[in-house]
Amino acid sequence: MIFEAHDYIPISSEAQRNIANLEQAYSAWLDTARSMHELPASMYWAQKNGADYLVAKLSAKDNGTAQGPRNAQTEQQHAQYLDEKQRLQARIAQQENILTERVALYKTRLFRLPQMIDLIGTILRQLDIEELLGIDVMVVGTNAFSAYELACGVRFPTGNEATEDFDLTWCRKTKAALTFNAGLTTRQQRKSLFAVLREIDPSYKINRSKPYQAINDKQYEVELLAAPSVHPLPKAEAFAPMYSLFEQESLLLGRPVSCVLATVSGKACPLVVPDPRFMALHKLWLSRKPERKSSKKDKDQRQGYVLLDAVRHFLSSSHPLNMDFVLDLPEDLRLIFDVWCKERHFVPVS
């Protein structure tokens, strides 16, 4: 199964400009959304023992914390809070209007660009606001392939079939996470993945028979995978991924890819996914895994070949298949890569 450059459908230059404009608009919106998130949910005066006290609620569910009795300092604190909140609300409203316009252009039927289902988009936006996306977790599985298409500037002939499965892999304090650390506040007390899911939908619960999986009342599943090297996870994390997923290790290597695409209903959706070279070889490895369900093996193989060939044709500058890459490969993946090279008469350059 060999894919040549002409087997892929080019994304037009106009569509690529719209993709870049959407990413720019989303980045501006995200900065404001994070600033809004840092503010208390509300700040108000409450009476206690006949005196006014300033109370701040960090979230809607918070009982509130007294900031002190009414005086010049707390009145100034309250006024500054109201001014900042009003300023950010005005800015984010303007940015959301721009985002709506950019998403509409992205979704132009002529371009036929990949789209994400709405629930996944909601989860990923919130993970991005909370500074978990790309820092603690990356998207893996079929949902990652939309990012690879945008990175390559083409639509794949196969491999990006619609799916409602949602898999994440843990990447905190790994080489992959370093790519996205720059410029973040990296709050000392960030929420856990499970806490973010519960904030979106309180019906999410950890599946007792599969503790690496959270499931809501509508039976939508979110799974967290983790390589042995990242265990144990933080105590605050309710997920309990299996310790034996050695194949996840390779997804923490190389240079991850990030992008922004549209959801079906017209929202922006960020994606951070593993290095496409390692994801492709990971998929080919899965297609050879004896315990793997036979129904999944064919899809794994198609995805692995179409992605690695796409890297060969379109990502030689950013993700070269050179000797440096070969030397970074674990032995089991190097054997698969050697076979792939022989089939294509491909010789990695120094």
Predicted regions and their residues:
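Compositionally biased terminal segments of proteins
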Residues: 1-53, 61, 66-350
